[in-house]
């Protein structure tokens, strides 16, 4: 049966960019990956076809050969001997780790070996996982021990992560002799590609584990305990080493990253380790002075003395009443900002008393307003002159 055009297989035009090729491949590979379509022979064949097409087109040199010679550039009477200098067919295999490698790596500022990396013997490090957790400001203040349910893969208990059935073990790939790569020559072209037999692992499994189907891992939801230290801020990232996705065929597990989001509070605002609270006070208290009770995030009430003549916006600093600093004995401060409340719903008598107060008042009782209106008068006088 004749092979389909590689560009048609990936659903892209012949002038598609490398990024467009990768995007198309990843999208289709996720759809047809054997792990997602177990027992579906058509999906398995489609997946192999996708790998072969992308493997040929992702490299500039092999893509140029394909554009010039078509499929003959790769199967023009060439055998399948592996290893450097040998000749072999082309094709590649992609695990789900390969497909999702970029997706899980990007959230930490780049790939940087964060998963999907193959080691000796075909071992592949598991992906790092991300878990978003929302906590209250009180929980950030006190710290807490939380339970998180993490979906993902864990090492297969039957084969202990090797992928091979009990009593057997992986063997050196006969095609590439354990190199994971094969070379093919066509005229002046010599192109090294991933081994089509072991998919770059250097090993094959004759007797796959029936529990994990040779993957070395199975899907399972886990419940983990996470210690959240007191003083964490919004956006804090907590790393749980080795609690990410299980590796392939005995490879190391990835890490789990807990990203914390602190919910807004109804009374307090936060700036680093400092807390801010706006407290309304009565006009009489602001005028004559007095004592008010203010809340703290720890649940205790603190008394604050308000001096005579206090104005809206006046701040009072309560040292050590703010947020704790993570991994430190230091503590931030609590700032109380008062707002003078104008009385409403006055009785007739209250209004009469205020009118008497107004009549008895002098400009010195309201220096800011008196000074402001004096400046306004000077401003207007300047226009008249």
UniProtKB/Swiss-Prot annotation:
Residues involved in Zn(2+) 1 binding: 156, 159, 209, 212
Zinc finger feature spans (CR-type): 143-221
Gene Ontology MF term list: ATP binding; heat shock protein binding; unfolded protein binding; zinc ion binding
Entry cofactors: Zn(2+)
Keyword Flavoprotein: no
Domain J positions: 5-70
Domain of life the protein comes from: Bacteria
CXXCXGXG motif repeats: 156-163, 173-180, 195-202, 209-216
PROSITE patterns cross-referenced by the UniProt entry: DNAJ_1 (PS00636), DNAJ_2 (PS50076), ZF_CR (PS51188)
Subunit structure: Homodimer.
Designated name of the protein: Chaperone protein DnaJ
Organism: Parvibaculum lavamentivorans (strain DS-1 / DSM 13023 / NCIMB 13966)
Encoding gene (name): dnaJ
């Amino acid at each position: 049966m004749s092979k389909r055009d590689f560009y048609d297989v990936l659903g892209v035009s012949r002038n598609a960019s490398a990024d467009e090729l990768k995007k198309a491949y990843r999208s289709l590979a996720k759809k047809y990956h054997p792990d997602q379509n177990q027992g579906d022979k058509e999906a398995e064949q489609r997946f192999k076809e996708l790998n072969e097409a992308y493997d040929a087109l992702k490299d500039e040199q092999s893509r140029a050969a394909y554009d010039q010679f078509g499929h003959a550039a790769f199967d023009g009477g060439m055998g399948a001997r592996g290893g450097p200098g040998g000749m072999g067919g082309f094709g590649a295999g992609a695990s789900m780790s390969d497909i999702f490698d970029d997706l899980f790596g990007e959230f930490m500022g780049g790939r940087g070996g964060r998963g999907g990396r193959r080691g000796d013997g075909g071992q592949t490090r598991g992906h790092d996982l991300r878990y978003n957790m929302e906590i209250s400001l009180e929980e950030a203040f006190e710290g807490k021990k939380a339970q998180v349910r993490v979906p993902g893969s864990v090492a297969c208990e039957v084969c202990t992560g090797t992928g091979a059935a009990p009593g057997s073990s992986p063997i050196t790939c006969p095609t590439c002799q354990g190199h994971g790569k094969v070379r093919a020559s066509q005229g002046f072209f010599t192109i090294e590609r991933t081994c089509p037999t072991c998919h770059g692992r250097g090993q094959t499994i004759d007797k796959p584990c029936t529990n994990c189907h040779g993957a070395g891992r199975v899907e399972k939801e886990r419940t983990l305990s996470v210690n959240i230290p007191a003083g964490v801020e919004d956006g804090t990232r907590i790393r749980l080493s080795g609690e990410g996705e299980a590796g392939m065929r005995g490879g190391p597990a990835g890490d789990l990253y807990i990203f914390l989001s602190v919910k807004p509070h109804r009374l307090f605002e936060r700036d680093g380790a400092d807390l801010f609270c706006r407290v309304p006070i009565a006009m009489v208290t602001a005028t004559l002075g007095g004592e008010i009770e203010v809340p703290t995030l720890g649940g205790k009430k603190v008394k604050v003395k308000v001096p005579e003549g206090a104005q809206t916006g006046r701040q009072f600093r309560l040292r050590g009443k703010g947020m704790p600093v993570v991994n430190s004995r230091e503590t931030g401060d609590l700032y109380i900002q008062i707002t003078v409340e104008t009385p409403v719903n006055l009785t007739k008598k209250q209004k009469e008393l205020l009118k008497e107060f107004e009549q008895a008042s002098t400009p010195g009782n309201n220096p800011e307003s008196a000074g402001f209106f004096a400046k306004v008068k000077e401003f207007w006088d300047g226009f008249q002159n």
